[in-house]
Amino acid sequence: MIAENKDYVKPDVNTLPAVLPAVAIRDVVMFPGMSLPLSVSRSKSIAAINLALDSNKYVVAVAQKEAEVEDPKAEDIYRFGVLSEITQSLKMPDGSIKVFLQGIARVKIEHLDFNNIANSWFASVFYPADEKVSGPEVTALMRQLLDEFEEYATVSRRIAVEGVSFFRQIEDPSRLADTIASNIIVKTSDRQDVLEAVNPKDRLELLIKILANEVEIISLEEKIHSKVRAQIEKNQKEYYLNEQMKAIQKELSQKDDFQKEIDELRSKIKKNGLPKNAKESAEKELDRLAKMAPFSPESTVSRTYLDWLVNMPWNSSTNDILDLKKAKEVMDADHYGLDKPKERILEYLAVSKLTNSLKGPILCFAGPPGVGKTSLAKSIASAVGRKFVRMSLGGVRDESEIRGHRRTYIGSMPGRIIQGISKAKSNNPVFLLDEIDKMGSDWRGDPAAALLELLDPEQNKDFSDHYLDVPFDVSKVMFITTANSLSSIPVTLRDRLEIIDFSGYTEYEKEAIAQNHLIPRQMKEHGLKEGSLEIGLPAVKLIMRDYVREAGVRNFEREISTICRKAAKMYVENCGKTVTVTKDNLHDFLGVPRYTNFTTEENGVGISTGLAWTSVGGETLSIEASEISDGKGRIMLTGKLGDVMKESVHAALTYARSKGYGKGIDFNKTDFHIHFPEGAVPKDGPSAGTAVTTALISLLTKNPVKKNLAMTGEVTITGRVLPIGGVKEKFMAAYREGVKTILYPHTNEKDVSEVPEVIRKQLKLIPVKHMDEIVKIAFEKGEPKSSFKKSKTAPKKESAKKAAKSKKPAVKKPAVKKTKQVKKTAKKKK
């Protein structure tokens, strides 16, 4: 019950202003004397409240005609309101304001204008005179109103009957009418009519009619409930809701909405062309629904299931754009390079055009972040004219995310595959399964195992979702998955994917992407018109070398965005003068360079440069070796190394010792420390074997490694150089760091063709089969001397000289040894 505030002192309306801020309120009509708590969240209403708080705390509270209108116009607001004072206000964290309004007097709004500057409505108001009425007729009306109100309180059970005694103490007819009107639950329009009734006598008569009508409606509702209760005594309780609906329909002559809904579902089952098994399941469920109570929990579950089943795009598909030229133009407009995936899509379209029927391919775009895997999938959907659906698999650990929940569970839903296809309203969309390598598994199941059926061309024609419980054909869907690393994808799942590698961009490709895509896009986003910002090509190259180190262009674009923000500020401050970015003033925009090319410039004794590959692209790897005399023959390894790399270091030292390097060193009393800088970064793999071996030989022979030389390859204890992976990424990283010469395994020559020609021309690429070849090339002072060669060759040469001087037959035997030794030495050198 809303009561008036007796402690409030009503101001004199003659002293109040004629123009006040106005607040449009929904679902409630304010009355004089009424105290109303109100939560204000709309911007125009907040502005009006703030204006009132800053001045005299008075606002006009006026109801809007339709509560659903979020941004009402002048015609949506009534022309009678209540002058109200803000007695309390509280600003909430979400920006809204909670206020308490105290109604003061009726006002008639003569003009309602919106002020764009203040973002608020302003009302020019007229204060109608509060007429004083009395006499027997008024007294009779007041008594009749109180009787009707008491009956209303009795039948509605919304107001305690004892509380009616409070209203009988009110002697002023105007105040009585306003107080009762603020405490009954009726339509907003009826309340507004009471507010607009300026004469208290008219107001009393109107309220009597409203209350009498409301009492009649409530009595009719009670009568319907009584009939239903009588029927329940004769029939089973499970038909309670059905009988209630029949009683309501009999009284109000309304159509059976539940039966209408069943008829609509039956019509959809016939029209939507469901497959035989799906149609049988839908009809069976519909028959069950028809026997249920309309508002029972079971009927809600059944209706939801039928909605999913009949609204699935069983036969709805989009027509592919089979124009190869147009498809290529669409993909080229959005992405520079990426020839392999584009070529694969064009091949699919060509075959589809020739056969008129083809299963959707299941592709996997594998590569480092920021190279355009996800965005290319969107372009493919646009190029082939299909709907696009994206599902992120990162962090997914529940099998039900893929295959849905069974309907026996509360709140069960289809899996996200079926949800995505239903949302697309097409059975052949381009469906992107993003970050497939980031899935996990726990007690809820393994999502990767659930994907086996989905991504198998031989099985996905009958993909079974636990919720639908009928097979759905997803063979027409073009599935595209993305991954940064293939190693974390289960072998059985990887076997079902057609892998397309996305290697990092070259500097030349990044330059083209920056000039044609990144810079224009960032300028547009930051409001910079053409000609307001100029970024020179040398500055673009410097950004790539000194500020970003990545295979893709995500951080590259972020740096360009930083330049655009600072350029926008300078452009505004300099009154529209063009901002030019050069390599000389680049640090003013981006600060101190984050990276320096130091790796290949510091090679010396015990230092070599290797090449590594990670999921985010290629990297150069500096390797340092040091010896500690008076030790215990230990090998110390630092740099957060994996087991494979540790074993590679041991193999390298074994090879170096077997070749006799390290004359005069007592290996039993010397410790060797091998360090890989950037110790916080985990490192593993055998491909640094050649670089580790070279660093150890350099240390043992005190022969420095050549500058601007890097190498990669696995080494065995006999010195054979074995093949490695990530050739393209490693070579691109070496080129970026200023390396001039690269030694790589001979068996990887076939992979060199994948390296862009513009990079191959600027690098000296030397394939090697054995560590002996690397030893001849890698050192500043030439090939290091082996202690074994010296100890074995000198005595044999001396015996050969003695044999040459002697003519005795007995000396011929060493001469034969000389010949064999010469042949053996020649063979070894070869």
UniProtKB/Swiss-Prot annotation:
One of its GO terms (molecular function) is sequence-specific DNA binding. Residues 602-781 form the Lon proteolytic domain. Residues 20-215 form the Lon N-terminal domain. It catalyses: Hydrolysis of proteins in presence of ATP. Keywords: ATP-binding, Cytoplasm, Hydrolase, Nucleotide-binding, Protease, Serine protease, Stress response. GO terms for biological process: cellular response to heat; protein quality control for misfolded or incompletely synthesized proteins. Pfam families: AAA (PF00004), Lon_C (PF05362), Lon_lid (PF22667), LON_substr_bdg (PF02190). It is found in: Cytoplasm. Its EC number is 3.4.21.53. Residues 784-830 are annotated as: Disordered. InterPro entries: AAA+_ATPase, ATPase_AAA_core, Lon_bac, Lon_bac/euk-typ, Lon_lid, Lon_proteolytic, Lon_Prtase, Lon_prtase_N. Induction: By heat shock. SUPFAM superfamilies: P-loop containing nucleoside triphosphate hydrolases, PUA domain-like, Ribosomal protein S5 domain 2-like. ATP binds at residues 367-374. The active site is at residues 687, 730. GO terms for cellular component: cytoplasm. It is an enzyme of class 3 (hydrolase). Residues 802-830 have a biased composition (Basic residues). Belongs to the peptidase S16 family. Homohexamer. Organized in a ring with a central cavity. NCBIfam families: lon, PRK10787.1. ATP-dependent serine protease that mediates the selective degradation of mutant and abnormal proteins as well as certain short-lived regulatory proteins. Required for cellular homeostasis and for survival from DNA damage and developmental changes induced by stress. Degrades polypeptides processively to yield small peptide fragments that are 5 to 10 amino acids long. Binds to DNA in a double-stranded, site-specific manner. This is Lon protease. It comes from Elusimicrobium minutum (strain Pei191). The gene is lon.
